[in-house]
UniProtKB/Swiss-Prot annotation:
Subunit structure and binding partners: Soluble monomer. Homotetramer. A dynamic intracellular population of tetramers and monomers coexists normally and the tetramer plays an essential role in maintaining homeostasis. Interacts with UCHL1. Interacts with phospholipase D and histones. Interacts (via N-terminus) with synphilin-1/SNCAIP; this interaction promotes formation of SNCA inclusions in the cytoplasm. Interacts with CALM1. Interacts with STXBP1; this interaction controls SNCA self-replicating aggregation. Interacts with SNARE components VAMP2 and SNAP25; these interactions allows SNARE complex assembly and integrity.
Residue ranges, annotated region (Interaction with SERF1A): 111-140
Organism for this UniProt entry: Sus scrofa (Pig)
A GO-annotated cellular component: neuronal cell body
PTM annotation, UniProt: Phosphorylated, predominantly on serine residues. Acetylation at Met-1 seems to be important for proper folding and native oligomeric structure.
Name of this protein: Alpha-synuclein
Residues modified as Phosphoserine: 87, 129
Length: 140
């Protein structure tokens, strides 16, 4: 029976040693897993931040391009409107077509939109000065 007890004791020591190694192995594996997860998480976060920044920059560029196109379009529409009004005025006899759109010296008049400061990189636009406007007093 003594041999039997000695054998069980050796088996117990082996199980304890294996359990310790397993516990140490599991703890080490858990530590490595945690490091790996944190590394992947940080790289993913960096990637997301970079991606969001890139999208924001591209969006800003597109808004700037659209803003420039809108200003160009508005200027073109205003110019065509002035030309159309000049043609109507000439056709109805309110003025000579070659004199419409010119100031007293005979030079072409500048439109209000041309005087408007536009900075596509800046989101703030200023209103044109009131010097470009003329007072209108209807005849009685």
């Amino acid at each position: 029976m003594d041999v039997f007890m000695k054998g069980l004791s050796k088996a117990k020591e082996g199980v304890v040693a294996a359990a310790e190694k397993t516990k140490q192995g599991v703890a080490e594996a858990a530590g490595k897993t945690k490091e790996g997860v944190l590394y992947v998480g940080s790289k993913t976060k960096e990637g997301v931040v970079h991606g969001v920044t890139t999208v924001a920059e591209k969006t800003k560029e597109q808004v700037t391009n659209v803003g420039e196109a809108v200003v160009t379009g508005v200027t073109a529409v205003a110019q065509k409107t002035v030309e159309g009004a000049g043609s109507i005025a000439a056709a109805t006899g309110f003025g000579k077509k070659d004199q419409l759109g010119k100031n007293e010296e005979g030079a072409p008049q500048e439109g209000i939109l041309e005087d408007m400061p536009v900075d596509p990189d800046n989101e703030a636009y200023e209103m044109p000065s009131e010097e470009g406007y003329q007072d209108y007093e209807p005849e009685a």
